[in-house]
A protein has these predicted regions:
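Bacterial Sec-dependent N-terminal signal peptides
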Residues: 1-21
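Buried hydrophobic residues that stabilize the cores of well-folded domains
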Residues: 19-244
Length: 244
């Protein structure tokens, strides 16, 4: 009997979404993708399962226009992001609305220079403002800052193998610690190795993928070299539809 049993659960992330969200190309999708239904399950040990209530999977649905832009992201029955875009010169700008139970909870504006300078996203809530800013210091180096209500939540530096590309991260520095990424031929991360301030390995994550005929992954399995308290490996599955 397997020592680990899988149960499907869903985690909602309401914070700012990463800069690789706005198009098929930035999400490494191949072909003319129309929509993605994505669910996540976790590998819980039996002792954890014994104290948990079973939950049904809640998919995250992504919709794209024929140009490849993300137009909607729907999480379960209550959460929806609606995207609008403007393109001019070397910029991509626009906005999206965070809708919860059919009520607009936040307006979000973003602007990005395609090949340099900065990328920024501002989320306006009723009581606070959330800001994510990326400053490109060179074609292979940038700094990222994340603030909520003027308070710094996270700061890190990223070094790339390719100029201005989020598909080939070399390593991330945060608070003196280092994360090193390696990739497969499809551009998906296969390992993340974590180092402490002294350069010693503290843990590593591994990822395995199953691909469809178009070359897009439809299953991603995560493993941990060392177990992490209250954190469990993920299995993410996708159902992808394409434009004719």
């Amino acid at each position: 009997m397997k020592s680990i049993i899988f149960i499907i659960v869903f985690t909602i992330h309401l914070g700012l979404l990463a800069q690789n969200e706005y198009s098929c190309a930035e999400m490494h999708l191949k072909g003319k993708v129309k929509s993605i239904a994505e669910t996540t399950q976790y590998a819980y040990p039996p002792q954890k399962l014994a104290t948990m209530k079973m939950q049904s999977p809640i998919p995250t649905l992504y919709s794209f226009n024929q140009r490849g832009d993300l137009t909607e992201k729907i999480i379960g029955a209550d959460i929806k992001y609606v995207y609008q875009y403007d393109r001019y010169q070397h910029y991509l700008s626009g906005g999206k609305k965070y809708v919860y139970s059919e009520k607009i909870k936040a307006d979000i504006m973003f602007i990005r220079v395609k090949d340099g300078a900065f990328w920024e996203e501002l989320t306006f809530y009723k009581k606070m403002t959330e800001k994510l800013r990326i400053d490109y210091l060179s074609p292979v180096h940038c700094k990222i800052s994340h603030t909520i209500g003027g308070k710094v939540i996270d700061e890190k530096e990223i070094y790339y193998q390719k100029p201005y590309s989020y598909s080939k991260i070399d390593y991330i520095l945060r608070d003196g610690k280092k994360e090193v990424y390696t990739y497969n031929d499809q551009g998906e991360v296969t390992t993340i190795i974590f180092y402490d301030e002294n350069g010693e390995v503290t843990n590593s994550y591994g990822y395995e993928y199953v691909y469809d005929a178009q070359g897009n992954w439809v299953e991603k399995k995560q493993t941990f070299q060392t177990p992490i308290p209250d954190k469990y490996p993920e299995i993410v599955r996708r159902e992808i539809t394409y434009y004719d």
